[in-house]
């Protein structure tokens, strides 16, 4: 018959056992909390980066990198929408060209998702500056992509109208109210 294991002794502040300060096989103590902090001593994406070694300058470089990653993710999102629109409008094109467009759209989507996950992991550093840089990057990328400054026509209303017209035409209907049958 098996004997039950004894409970560990309570910690200094209550009933819970003391938390380990180091993971087995790790040389660094676990000091990251689960609440947002302010300060330049953050670890973002890689061990000891930007960390404490280079001061505030490396921290600002880290914030600029997170901002750029988030802006690029938004720009790729706009490019993905543009590729989807091109695919919808190119039903009459050759099969080989359509397949290339589909592969390109899949590649853009994969790159966008990879960047989005990197930004998410950076925000998981629980540094408020990194969070603000990510939000600012997404906003800047959205603004640039929608304003057409990146050379994308995906934001232009006439393109959206053309896509709706192409979809309506392929369904056999028309968007113009005067072309509806009269009762």
Swiss-Prot record:
It is a multi-pass membrane protein. The chain crosses the membrane at residues 56-76, 115-135. Disulfide bonds: none annotated. It is found in: Membrane. Involved in the transport of copper. Residues 1-21 are annotated as: Disordered. Belongs to the copper transporter (Ctr) (TC 1.A.56) family. SLC31A subfamily. Keywords: Copper, Copper transport, Ion transport, Membrane, Transmembrane, Transmembrane helix, Transport. The gene is COPT4. One of its GO terms (molecular function) is copper ion transmembrane transporter activity. PANTHER family: COPPER TRANSPORTER 4, SOLUTE CARRIER FAMILY 31 COPPER TRANSPORTERS. GO terms for cellular component: plasma membrane. Pfam families: Ctr (PF04145). This is Copper transporter 4.
